């Protein structure tokens, strides 16, 4: 990822190396709690049903507690009966956002911050990208995460 805009002194051109061509897709998936980002996973390639189910069973479910609520958007990979069953077996409740409502998804705000961080670090190799993602996840404070939920109009009641 690279920044699309930059600054330079008046009269000088802003120059920075930017990769060209279409690179590989890297997908990040994670969960957001009031305390911070949790259950992160990076996947080479696009998200699909089998990959999301593996994420839920192997990464997300071990972090869930009875009574937790798992909010997901309407990606087809999220709607698998096996995903629902795995979440419910952990004592958590799966819920889906209304269609076309990213403003009600607090993790979208966190993803925006993470993407800005990744553009700033300008990682050019897969290993550097994975390291940058790990460093970016650690920048989320509990107060900031609580504010994401407040901005998405969630409350603790």
Which functions belong to the PLM regions below?
Residues 1-157:
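Short functional hotspots at interaction and active-site rims
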């Amino acid at each position: 990822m690279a920044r699309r805009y930059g600054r330079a002194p008046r009269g000088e051109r802003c120059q920075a190396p930017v990769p060209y061509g279409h690179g590989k897709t890297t997908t990040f998936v994670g969960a957001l709690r009031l305390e911070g980002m949790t259950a992160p996973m990076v996947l080479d390639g696009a998200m699909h049903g089998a990959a999301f189910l593996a994420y839920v069973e192997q990464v997300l479910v071990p972090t869930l507690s009875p009574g937790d609520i798992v909010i997901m958007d309407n990606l087809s990979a999220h709607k698998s009966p096996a995903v629902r069953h795995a979440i419910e077996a952990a004592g958590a409740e799966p819920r889906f956002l209304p269609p076309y409502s990213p403003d009600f998804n607090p993790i979208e705000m966190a993803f925006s911050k993470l993407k800005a961080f990744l553009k700033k670090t300008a990682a050019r190799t897969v290993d550097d990208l994975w390291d940058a993602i790990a460093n970016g996840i650690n920048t989320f404070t509990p107060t900031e995460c609580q504010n994401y939920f407040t901005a998405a109009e969630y409350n603790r009641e």
